[in-house]
Swiss-Prot record:
Taxonomy, superkingdom: Eukaryota
Transmembrane parts of this sequence: 18-38, 60-74, 86-111, 241-265
Similarity comment text for this entry: Belongs to the tetraspanin (TM4SF) family.
UniProt cross-references to CDD domains, sorted A to Z: CD37_CD82_like_LEL
UniProt function note: Structural component of specialized membrane microdomains known as tetraspanin-enriched microdomains (TERMs), which act as platforms for receptor clustering and signaling. Participates thereby in diverse biological functions such as cell signal transduction, adhesion, migration and protein trafficking. Upon ligand binding, two signaling pathways are activated, one acting through phosphorylation by LYN leading to cell death or a survival pathway with activation of GSK3B.
Gene this protein is translated from: CD37
Keyword Calcium tagged: no
GO CC annotation: plasma membrane
Reported modifications of this chain: Tyrosine phosphorylated; leading to activation of downstream signaling pathways.
Organism encoding this protein: Bos taurus
Membrane-protein topology: Multi-pass membrane protein
Native organism taxonomy: Eukaryota, Metazoa, Chordata, Craniata, Vertebrata
Name of this protein: Leukocyte antigen CD37
Principal subcellular localization: membrane
Cytoplasmic side: 1-17, 75-85, 266-280
InterPro entries: Tetraspanin/Peripherin (IPR018499), Tetraspanin_animals (IPR000301), Tetraspanin_CS (IPR018503), Tetraspanin_EC2_sf (IPR008952)
């Protein structure tokens, strides 16, 4: 075996092993998404967050797993069987993904003001329509989760929630905000969420879907977060910018590496005897 043949064999098996790893990873992601979709109660008990929009994330994970498995399968079969058509398709798909990521990065960098305004509009619409459609709670649950995790209330301030119809039980009642705005650390009652509403408890199987429980709200003059989420979200993005950029660069470098290996293998295969001819 010549040095050239040895190099081709090394590239072929490297590409195969790497894609086999990502195929297994995609399978795990897909199974994880299906598990969340089918058995929500067990997953809620596992993570301890009953108000997360699990259905959305389960579908995202399932689709991501399928796409990862499909792309990895192209790389595995194309490399192992030395099929130029599959290697070319694999390279083209990776190139498309890489170009999409670059385009999104440029758009986010140049359209930050417009994106921020769009996010603000979506959040304000979610607040205005809070609990008006009990069957459509994904956006509301997502925003509750943001407020709970980032310890904030409303977009600009808690006043965003004032005068929202679903927050008042009667006209004489004062302003109220969702339970996700409640600052439990400001009190000595560590079980406040269990007492306020099952949707914020960490009781797993005892948790109920939002549309089966009364709207959970607390008085605006109680212990609530006084800062809006706009600043907290900006701070979170700033604090995690290095991690986000690092992940994006890592994914981009992986894609470039796989593209390089696949195009090298594709171009250096025997031009006279294509392995695909065996199966014609």
């Amino acid at each position: 075996m010549s040095a050239h043949d040895g190099c081709l064999s090394l590239v072929k098996y490297l590409l195969f092993v790497f894609n086999l790893f990502f195929f297994v990873l995609g399978s795990l992601i897909f199974c994880f998404g299906i598990w969340i979709l089918i058995d929500k109660t067990s997953f809620v008990s596992f993570v301890g967050l009953s108000f997360m929009p699990l259905q959305i994330w389960s579908k995202v994970l399932a689709v991501s797993g399928i796409l990862t498995m499909g792309l990895a399968l192209l790389g595995c079969v194309g490399a192992l069987k030395e099929f130029r058509c599959l290697l070319g398709l694999y390279f083209g798909t990776l190139l498309l993904l890489f170009a999409t990521q670059i385009t999104l990065g440029i758009l986010i960098s140049t359209q930050r003001v417009q994106l921020k305004k769009k996010v603000k509009d979506v959040v304000q619409k979610t607040i205005q329509n809070y609990r008006t459609h009990p069957e459509e709670t994904a956006a509301e649950e997502s925003w509750d989760y943001v407020q709970f995790q980032l310890r904030c209330c409303g977009w600009e301030s808690p006043q965003d929630w004032f005068h929202i119809p679903s927050m008042r039980r009667n006209e004489s009642e004062g302003d109220r905000v969702p339970c996700s705005c409640y600052n439990s650390s400001a009190t000595n009652d560590s079980t406040i969420f269990d007492k306020i509403s099952p949707q914020f408890s960490r009781l797993g199987s005892l948790a109920q879907p939002r549309h089966n429980v009364e709207v959970c709200s607390v008085p605006a003059n109680s212990y609530i977060y006084q800062q809006g989420c706009e600043r907290n979200l900006s701070n979170w993005l700033t604090n995690n910018l290095i991690s986000i950029v690092g992940i994006c660069l890592g994914v981009g470098l992986l894609e470039l590496s796989f593209m390089t290996l696949s195009i090298f293998l594709c171009r250096n295969l025997d031009h006279v005897y294509d392995r695909l001819a065996r199966y014609r």
